[in-house]
Amino acid sequence: DHEIAAAAGVPIPTIFEMEGEQGFRSRETAILKKLIVLPHIVLSTGGGAVLKEENRALIRKSGTVVYLHAPPETLLERTRCDNSRPLLQVADPLAKLRELYAARDPVYRQTADFTVESANCRETVQTLLKRLSR
């Protein structure tokens, strides 16, 4: 999302306001195409990036894909004070996160080479280092 906002010159909520989610997703694909050709990068995509088949194909071609899994309740804690997430600016953000999770979790699992639970930062890093060094 950072790269999308930087390229657009405006924050993500402004892109959503002006172009809607569809416009944002188009920008997301364009940025992915630019980033995946860079050597030796760690690419952290936005939550909805894998919903588009074209993006999934791009991501899979770029290298090892890791799904950093967290349940909706954990995601709410992590995003509670983040006003830059247009899809969560609703009356019940936990319900929205559960809805997004139900739709996205199977796609993330299908796209990823492996999944890592991301509840504890230190354990997540240790698991990633072990898995990626194989």
UniProtKB/Swiss-Prot annotation:
Keyword set includes ATP-binding: yes
An MF annotation (GO) of this entry: ATP binding
Domain of life: Bacteria
Pathway field: Metabolic intermediate biosynthesis; chorismate biosynthesis; chorismate from D-erythrose 4-phosphate and phosphoenolpyruvate: step 5/7
UniProt entry keywords in alphabetical sequence: Amino-acid biosynthesis, Aromatic amino acid biosynthesis, ATP-binding, Cytoplasm, Kinase, Nucleotide-binding, Transferase
Transmembrane spans: none
Family matches, as CDD domains: SK
GO CC list: cytosol
One Pfam family this sequence matches: SKI
Family statement: Belongs to the shikimate kinase family.
Name of the featured protein: Shikimate kinase
Lineage start: Bacteria, Pseudomonadati, Pseudomonadota, Betaproteobacteria, Neisseriales
Gene that specifies this protein: aroK
